[in-house]
Amino acid sequence: MHTYQTLTLAEANLILDAAQAKAEALGVPEVLCVADNAGYPVALRRLDGGKVTSVQIAMNKAFTAACHRKPTHMYKNALPGEEAFGIFTQHEGRFTVFVGGFPVLVEGQVVGAIAASGGSGEQDTEVCQAGIDALVRHLGKK
């Protein structure tokens, strides 16, 4: 039998606080989602000016990163003409290959994911990394 850990609401909010601060520093109106280890949202924030359409995209990025245990941009083989093209039609269309979804690992185990939608791929990545870094610092202090 396996025991799985997942992010708590407090940890999700810690991640989102740091990600939001980074998004605001970049001047990007992001939608941010932290999911549990099963890909379901624990916490979601739509920053002022964040696009309504980015809400579902952020949730899908978090789902993909948590459930498939890889950053969403690692699925380039799902683009047209590639081996895994069409995988995005699975899981009710929730699988996504857009940049900006990252698994959150603790001691090598995926405990959840963070995703950002609303900026460029580079901005989304920076915002997510700020959230992950905040959790790492927090856990290091325990």
Predicted regions: what they are:
Residues 1-142:
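Flexible, solvent-exposed loop/hinge segments and secondary-structure transition points
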